[in-house]
Amino acid sequence: MKRIHAFLFSSLVVILSIVMVGCKDTGKTLTSATGSIYECLVVMNNQALTQDELNAVAHKSLVNEASGYSEPISTTYDLVKAVMAADMPAMPQMEPYFKLTQVNMTYFDDILKPTRNILFVDIDPNKYTQLKVKVANNNWSKPQAVCRIQSPSQEEFVAYWLEKGEGIREWFVNQELKRQTQFYKASTNKDARTILQAQGYDMLIPEDYIIILDTLLGGATTYSLRQPATVASNTRVLWCCNNKGPMRRDIVIYSYPYTNPKTFTAEFLNEKRDAVVSRLVHGSVDGSFMGTEYKVMPPQMRTILVQDSAQAYEIRGLWRIQHGEAMGGPYVSHTRLDHVNGRVVTAETFIYAAGQKKRNALRQAEAILYTLQLPEDK
């Protein structure tokens, strides 16, 4: 079986097309970072865009339904905001990637230095002769992510941001995901981990998740299902849930033999998801079950890198209860090929939080998916 070649989708590769210098943690004692997850401080002097720059922005089509941003763009900060605060894809309500706060360079002081995520945009022809991007962790606090864009002209910055801004945003997202996975290392469900390790896998499922269904080890162990769950004979499933508080979070890991060359297509993976979750998740109305929303917001698939260099297929979409009550929410899945055992492995998280914002909860659960290790990762 040929190994799937990793498609370098990683945002870091995108950013590295411009000179980038990464700064390591100095090891010194640092204060705790301030601010909440997925908040970012933008430090820059806001300037009006020229007509040529406005034309370039219009050509890029940053402001439209597909881009997830609808506010007018007339200044350099507007341009940054159009990318950093664009709406996340496949969410039931509009929620931005990041909540932003902007201050001018002269107002950045010791009070603001511990901020969790900081993006500097410094445009100065007297200091710089070429555009550079520098990233660092834990400059003034911990955990902290800092990105500096240094440009000799506004024109060069605008051109760079239009091409690479999404890569900068993805770098900040990745920093948040990494912080969350570090937290999970100290708090894991040992029983779930033992079940996965028996299959040659590993995953940091938090200890506040309970096991609902396990067919990974053969047979079926059901813990707390309202209705019986069934799975295909060649499919193995581990289903865990955190139902504490007003929000429910679920993790489902399932695997099946790799026999179809069309496996890693959106059509195949979506059909496989429906086949699995419709048998697992039922509503309170007899005959109701979980399905995927295709009409209002079709699932979106892309290739990502996990475990440093392994290829995974990410799908974001909306789930809903079919033939039952009005229930639904967002989900994210990662699918990979287990080369050692010749199986396809999918790890998915879906959440239910009626009337609540879901970005942070989904991102926290999504971080669990990034901890999945297959035999070839070890």
Question: What feature does the model see in each segment?
Answer:
Residues 18-22:
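C-terminal motif of bacterial Sec signal peptides marking the signal peptidase cleavage site
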Residues 1-11:
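Bacterial N-terminal signal peptides that target proteins for export
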Residues 33-164, 169:
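Long, folded non-catalytic interaction modules
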Residues 24-27:
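Bacterial signal peptide processing site
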Residues 144-153, 249-256, 342-352:
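Short, well-ordered beta-strand elements
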